[in-house]
């Protein structure tokens, strides 16, 4: 969030005193140089366990590609596409995969008429930023007043937002490690939210 990284060895020595460092990439050498300081880091692999903007959206993955350093997890294109819910939905639809009916709203456009949305999408609705994760900026909407507040909140996180039909049912997740034909698929997990939605 602040453009600094915590080096594990220094952090373990004194977590409170370690303020983080900036890293300068040296692509030809597959390394990073710390700023301040002159420590050179040669990572063998990158574990991208950073959430949110810059972590899940293809930025770190693209840096790893540029540096020719292997990275664990989704590659640059998969990360970027899946981070943008509008692009994800358009791609799924192009392959005939059903998604919840939705409308896209862009910053600066008038808030859609609630009654018209109900006739097109039903109730309740979910309003969510197109580019965000972890349910940040997501609202469940059941009135015109809630719609206005939800659109404002979602636009704090993304210029494009989705207004989507709420689907009732179980939410399942599956992890895939590797690429065909050598990929491995996890067991199916069910998400049981602790709140009204996950």
Regions inferred by a protein language model and the residue ranges of each:
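ATP-binding N-terminal substructure of ATP-dependent carboxylate-amine bond-forming enzymes
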Residues: 1-77, 81-83, 87, 94, ...
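Glycine-rich phosphate/pyrophosphate-binding beta-alpha loops
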Residues: 52, 135, 191-194
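Residue-level detector of anion-binding/catalytic polar loops
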Residues: 70, 98, 160
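Short gly/pro/ser/thr-enriched loop/turn and capping motifs at secondary-structure boundaries
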Residues: 77-82, 133, 194-195
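Basic phosphate/pyrophosphate-binding loop/patch that engages nucleotide-derived ligands
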Residues: 91-99, 153
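ATP-grasp fold ATP-binding core
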Residues: 92-93, 118-136, 159-168, 172
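Glycine-rich phosphate-binding loop of ATP-grasp-fold ATP-dependent ligases
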Residues: 100-104, 125-152, 171-173
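Phosphate-binding site of ATP-dependent enzymes
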Residues: 142-198
